[in-house]
């Protein structure tokens, strides 16, 4: 069976690209189609033939392919997939609208329908600059139409969480299998990690005192709500380590001033990230994610999660065993959750029991389990 693998753009190694790399392992002889590809920024695809759409040939097409998202429905339809029996797309909007025959099977692993034109439009619009706001207003209906239309080319949807499955049902009117993304649980479960952290530029070393700080890890983008984690810890006088970069970093650093309890480390190596997880009191996860790999990584390292009880985290954290949820999407809600975590009695004080529960839960999200469940979902009738 000749197979084609599709991904919207391959220009960085983030969560969606890690899923796609796992699909590449599953289908080592498959050809890859994408709107833009940077071979030096994406790993795991060197053995595959990679074909780009015309988007890559446009000005800045490889550097900022998202600027051409409005053209991607047309680019997707022009991909020549006639020779393939099975088409597997890894998708959040602008690649699944392909042209296919009725005897070709198209399975879409959906990270989410286009959040920025559907239920998260307001959040993305608020965070966009003037040009972005204008583009969103102009192209929203256009992209909604093509997102709905492109779903017609899919024979089987596979969602990355129950949260996304519900969104697929609400927007596309389609049922989905649920297969959680693969997480490198074995790496983060390895208990041999250091006790200090070096910033990405190598300039500073910050000691990690086990159990003395909370951790935020992820991009510093508005919808992930790092501001809530920072403000809650400032209000409560708690130590917080922030790992990750993004547009909000400068603003967040200014907001804390000379508060020595809040440390921004920027991007760090995987080894440092593992140490950060393993030595944290708990991970703070105040955003709504489609799935959210970070909480699983933290649990693999034996660290519990304090999270807003919405989104994919409902699939990955066991309340009362590997973390706790709060319902009010405010700084006050997070402060209350942190207080509840700290006064929760022996439940969270028995570190070895909590760590064992976290690691056992994280094992459910291994790459091996992902590949096994994907094989079942991709099979006809799956």
Task: Map each language-model feature to its residues.
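Membrane-proximal helix-turn-helix segments that form the acceptor-binding/catalytic region
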Residues: 129-157, 165
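Acidic donor-binding loop of glycosyltransferase active sites
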Residues: 214, 278-290, 303
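Active-site donor-binding segments of glycosyltransferases and PAPS-dependent sulfotransferases
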Residues: 26-94
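Short hydrophobic beta-strand element within catalytic cores of glycosyltransferases
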Residues: 304-308, 317
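A charged, aromatic-enriched C-terminal amphipathic alpha-helix characteristic of glycosyltransferases
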Residues: 329, 349-379
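Conserved acidic donor-binding segment of nucleotide-sugar-dependent glycosyltransferases
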Residues: 319-320, 324-331, 338-350
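Nucleotide-activated donor-binding/catalytic signature segment of Leloir-type glycosyltransferases, i.e.
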Residues: 250-272
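Short alpha-helical donor nucleotide-sugar binding micro-motif in glycosyltransferases
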Residues: 275-280, 374
């Amino acid at each position: 069976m000749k197979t084609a693998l599709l991904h919207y753009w391959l220009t960085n190694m983030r969560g969606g690209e890690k899923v796609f790399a796992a699909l590449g392992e599953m289908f080592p002889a498959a050809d890859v189609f994408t709107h833009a590809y940077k071979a030096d920024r994406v790993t795991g695809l060197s053995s595959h033939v990679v074909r780009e759409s015309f988007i890559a040939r446009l000005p800045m097409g490889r550097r900022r392919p998202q600027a051409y998202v409005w053209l991607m429905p047309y680019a997707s339809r022009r991909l020549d997939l006639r020779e393939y029996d099975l088409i597997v797309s890894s998708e959040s909007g602008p690649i699944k609208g392909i042209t296919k025959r009725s005897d070709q099977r198209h399975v879409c692993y959906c990270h989410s329908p286009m959040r920025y034109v559907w239920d998260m439009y307001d959040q993305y619009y608020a965070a966009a600059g003037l040009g972005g706001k204008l583009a969103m207003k102009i192209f929203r209906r256009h992209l909604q139409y093509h997102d709905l239309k492109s779903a017609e080319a899919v024979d089987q949807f596979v969602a990355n969480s129950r949260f996304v499955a519900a969104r697929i049902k609400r927007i596309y009117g389609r049922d989905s299998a649920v297969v959680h993304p693969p997480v490198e649980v074995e790496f983060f479960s390895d208990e041999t990690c250091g006790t200090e952290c070096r910033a990405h530029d190598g300039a500073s070393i910050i000691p990690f005192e086990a159990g003395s700080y909370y951790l935020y890890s992820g991009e510093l983008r508005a919808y992930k709500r790092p501001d809530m984690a920072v403000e809650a810890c400032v209000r409560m006088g708690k130590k917080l380590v922030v790992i990750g970069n993004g547009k909000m970093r400068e603003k967040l650093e200014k907001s804390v001033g000379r508060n020595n309890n809040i440390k921004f480390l920027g991007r760090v190596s995987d080894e440092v990230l593992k140490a950060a997880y393993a030595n944290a009191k708990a991970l703070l996860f105040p955003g709504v994610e489609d799935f959210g790999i970070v909480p699983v990584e933290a649990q693999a390292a034996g660290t519990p999660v304090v999270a807003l009880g919405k989104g994919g985290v409902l699939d990955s954290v066991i309340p009362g065993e590997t973390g706790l949820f709060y319902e009010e999407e405010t700084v006050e809600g997070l402060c209350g959750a942190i207080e509840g975590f700290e006064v929760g009695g022996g439940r969270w004080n028995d570190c070895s029991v909590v760590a064992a529960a976290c690691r056992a839960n994280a094992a459910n999200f291994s790459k091996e389990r992902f590949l096994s469940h994907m094989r079942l979902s991709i099979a006809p009738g799956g």
